[in-house]
């Protein structure tokens, strides 16, 4: 598996669920994901690209086929370039005409012609001419059209000179989506849109969208951004981001405005139904619904489009903040109540535990709130219950927890058991100085797996002024610290050495190449491109052991990626090193 193309760089900066805040760089232009691309129709602009740029939209999408087919637009684009023609300095992505192909059945351009045209007009991100098979198409049709898409992908790979989308197709057949994702992952592309879902979104078949996205994500390499083609309503953003979607596009902001429809994060309302605007954007702060209704159609459409854009932008920000706070699942739960079909999709997503758990952070900034029955099925809850089973058997002394059931009291100080809220209180008893070591040993087994407690069995535990376990030492040397915020262990270098001795390879290891070795020894962060191998069991924010190819300990630190991600990612940090051996 190649490590991707240097024309586009993508790295993860923060995460929750399978969602991630990323930094995407194309041609020296940087944006933060999740991001939304307003769709710009070059023949009919409701909002000018320059105004979109002023509003803070750093990426837009337009249709290269529409430009290609229109003689005047084609001449302008070839003469001026796409950025000057649209008067827009941000990242410009283009579609290839696939949507027109799905809508009208045929288009008058070949795959090679549209790719070469995209090169010539200077787009930042291109798209080859895939075939978007509609939902519920006969399997024979889906297979045949997918093979044509893959053939065109091979042609695009040979001639592409710019970062390019490789769209995952396959209708509603999840095995075909996985097959397409595996094949395209092995090729030299930069972004993977998931296509053919607009009819599903329009008919509120969100459950099918979940199955399609998860099937695709399971087979895609995790270092490439994923774009959910045609998903532009804020009602789906939280759910889609929780699945690992990074990019969205919206034509609906303008289409809805033309139909006098007003977007909210919970759905869409007709303008004539509104007495008040439940929003404080510049449009809604200035006008009343009555004033908008009395305006000429063109002016009203433009103002509604601006409102819709502000709502879209606000919801993307809300999703990002939820990721930062470790509250993404809570937002998904809240948004799922907006529509029964969305609620069904949310419940379906929670069935994909194996996929979700790999990316679920091991610890979070916010406490876990039981806000619904579904919150008991969140990945963080299921994982904690599974891990606690062996601790319960070995350490015993079970107490009743309102979320997790019967749990060993020696886990009662640790995330998420202590940092959680339900209808009933969970009483945390402070340990005595004598049994504090049992807490540390139980935490070690929970955090690092079977056998990890042996690294601490002769240690002494110092209590804080509040009576909580804090420093773990042997002969005055610090092995670890029990963190005050989440009750998990941060390793000192002496503790890392002991853990390295008792845990079999490759448990909790991140293996780096010779180039990175001297930097890791000195306590410098480990970047993903230097990682040769990592324990597949490593989860984001785990405490890990950094080693060389001979399994010699170099450093200890906090994983920022899952083990599988570390091996594949080309950009960004893999481990925030806390201490090197030197």
Swiss-Prot record:
Record's keyword terms, sorted: Glycosyltransferase, Metal-binding, Transferase, tRNA processing, Zinc
Domain of life from the UniProt record: Archaea
As its record notes, the protein acts as a catalyst of: guanosine(15) in tRNA + 7-cyano-7-deazaguanine = 7-cyano-7-carbaguanosine(15) in tRNA + guanine
**Residues reported in the UniProt entry to bind substrate:** 130, 196
Its UniProt pathway annotation is:
tRNA modification; archaeosine-tRNA biosynthesis
Q: Which Pfam families match?
A: PUA (PF01472), TGT (PF01702), TGT_C1 (PF14809), TGT_C2 (PF14810)
SS bond list = none
Give GO terms: molecular function aspect only: pentosyltransferase activity; RNA binding; zinc ion binding
Instruction: Give GO cellular component annotations, separated by semicolons.
Output: cytoplasm
- Name the residues annotated as catalytic in the UniProt entry: 95
Q: Which cofactor does it need?
A: Zn(2+)
Cofactor remark? Binds 1 zinc ion per subunit.
InterPro entries, per this entry?
ArchSynthase1/Queuine_TRR, ArcTGT_C1_sf, PUA, PUA-like_sf, PUA_sf, TGT-like_sf, TGT_C1, TGT_C2
| Start and end residues of each PUA domain | 507-582
Single Gene Ontology BP term?
tRNA wobble guanine modification
* Binding residues annotated for Zn(2+), in chain numbering: 279, 281, 284
Query: E.C. number, please?
Result: 2.4.2.48
Q: How does it assemble?
A: Homodimer.
| Functional summary from the UniProt entry | Exchanges the guanine residue with 7-cyano-7-deazaguanine (preQ0) at position 15 in the dihydrouridine loop (D-loop) of archaeal tRNAs.
Give the family from UniProt. Belongs to the archaeosine tRNA-ribosyltransferase family.
Q: What is this protein called?
A: tRNA-guanine(15) transglycosylase
Which gene specifies this protein's sequence?
A: tgtA
């Amino acid at each position: 598996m190649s490590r991707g193309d240097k024309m586009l760089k993508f790295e993860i900066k923060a995460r929750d669920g399978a969602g991630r805040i990323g930094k995407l760089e194309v041609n020296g232009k940087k944006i933060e994901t999740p991001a939304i691309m307003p769709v710009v129709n070059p023949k009919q602009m409701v909002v000018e690209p320059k105004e979109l740029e002023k509003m803070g939209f750093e990426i837009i999408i337009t249709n290269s086929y529409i430009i290609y087919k229109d003689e005047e637009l084609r001449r302008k684009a070839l003469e001026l370039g796409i950025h000057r023609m649209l008067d827009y300095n941000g990242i410009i992505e283009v579609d290839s005409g696939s949507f027109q192909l799905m809508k009208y059945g045929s288009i008058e351009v070949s795959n090679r012609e549209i790719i070469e045209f995209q090169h010539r007009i200077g787009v930042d991100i291109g798209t080859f001419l895939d075939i978007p098979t509609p939902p519920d198409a006969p399997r024979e049709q889906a297979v045949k059209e997918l093979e044509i898409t893959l053939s065109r992908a091979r042609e695009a790979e040979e001639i592409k000179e710019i970062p390019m989308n490789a769209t995952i197709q396959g209708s509603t057949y999840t095995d075909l989506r996985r097959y397409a994702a595996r094949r395209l992952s092995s090729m030299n592309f930069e972004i993977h849109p998931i296509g053919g879902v607009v009819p599903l979104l329009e008919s509120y078949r969100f459950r099918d969208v979940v199955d399609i996205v998860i099937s695709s994500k399971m087979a895609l390499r995790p270092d490439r951004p994923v774009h959910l083609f045609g998903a532009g309503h804020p009602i789906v953003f939280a759910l889609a981001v929780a699945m690992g979607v990074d990019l969205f596009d919206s034509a609906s902001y303008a289409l809805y405005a033309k139909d006098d429809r007003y977007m909210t994060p919970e759905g869409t309302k007709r303008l004539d139904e509104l007495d008040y605007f439940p929003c404080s954007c510049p449009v809604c702060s200035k006008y009343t619904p009555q004033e908008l209704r009395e305006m000429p159609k063109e002016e009203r459409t433009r103002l509604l489009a601006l409102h819709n854009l502000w709502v879209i932008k606000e919801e993307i920000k809300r999703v990002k903040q939820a990721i930062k706070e470790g509250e993404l699942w809570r937002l998904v739960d809240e948004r799922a109540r907006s529509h029964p079909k969305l609620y069904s999709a949310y419940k379906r997503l929670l069935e994909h535990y194996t996929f979700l758990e790999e990316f679920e952070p091991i610890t979070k900034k916010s406490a876990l709130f039981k806000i619904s029955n579904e919150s008991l099925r969140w990945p963080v809850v299921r994982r904690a219950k599974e891990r606690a089973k062996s601790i319960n058997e070995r350490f015993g002394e079970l107490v009743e927890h309102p979320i997790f059931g019967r749990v060993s009291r020696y886990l009662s100080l640790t995330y998420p058991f202590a940092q959680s809220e339900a209808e009933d209180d969970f009483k945390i008893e402070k340990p005595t100085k004598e049994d504090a070591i049992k807490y540390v040993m139980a935490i070690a087994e929970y955090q690092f797996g079977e056998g990890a407690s042996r690294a601490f069995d002769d240690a002494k535990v110092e209590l804080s002024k509040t009576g909580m376990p804090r420093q773990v030492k042997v002969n005055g040397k610090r092995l670890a610290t029990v963190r005050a915020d989440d009750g998990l262990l941060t390793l000192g270098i002496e503790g890392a050495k002991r853990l390295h001795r008792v845990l079999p390879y490759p448990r909790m290891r991140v293996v780096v190449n010779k180039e990175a070795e001297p930097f890791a020894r000195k306590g410098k962060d480990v970047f993903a491109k230097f990682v040769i191998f990592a324990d597949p069991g490593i989860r984001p924010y785990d405490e890990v052991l950094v080693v060389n190819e001979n399994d010699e300990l170099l450093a200890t630190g906090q994983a920022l990626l899952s083990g599988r991600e570390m091996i594949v990612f080309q950009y960004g940090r893999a481990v925030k090193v806390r201490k090197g051996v030197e």
